[in-house]
Amino acid sequence: MNEDNIKLLQSSTSDNVKKFSLCDKMFISKCISIYDGDSATFCIVLHNQIYKFNMRLSGIDTPEMRPLKTKPNRDLEKKASIISRNKLLQLVTDQNINLHTAYSKREIKNILNINKKLLYIKCGKFDKYGRCLVKLYNTKDHIKSFNNILVENGYAYKYYGGKKKDDFTSYFSHLNHC
């Protein structure tokens, strides 16, 4: 570390240092991992280096991969989460992905590793889990986000924080009949 950076650090206070943010920034990205229908890892170029960030699609919620064991419709939710996750995989790769297949993490990473498709993300704030909230787009003109596509086609519902829906029975049964 050079002497100028050391002096900068020594003079730092909570009042004179900005908090790191990606808010309102647009990036070209590549999806390298998908956890569920609204959570994935993307690579972006920042300061001439490639970084990976865990990101969550903003404004939506999808079924959980690991719902609480006490949930009455747990098995239905797990099946619906696979369908939602695979729909996101289909969107980010432009590949014919079987929505009902329970792909392993390794299989998903292999699909994403060979995929060369680049996506556009518009960043928001970081959530309570440290994930950057993003709108995900196919093109840089960001006409229609994947977030909205997932909602419009029944793979997600609108969600802006706070208490989540308790009863998803009709939502899950719709997904399980896709």
What are these regions (language model features)?
Residues 1-178:
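Small beta-barrel nucleic-acid-binding modules, primarily SNase/OB-fold domains
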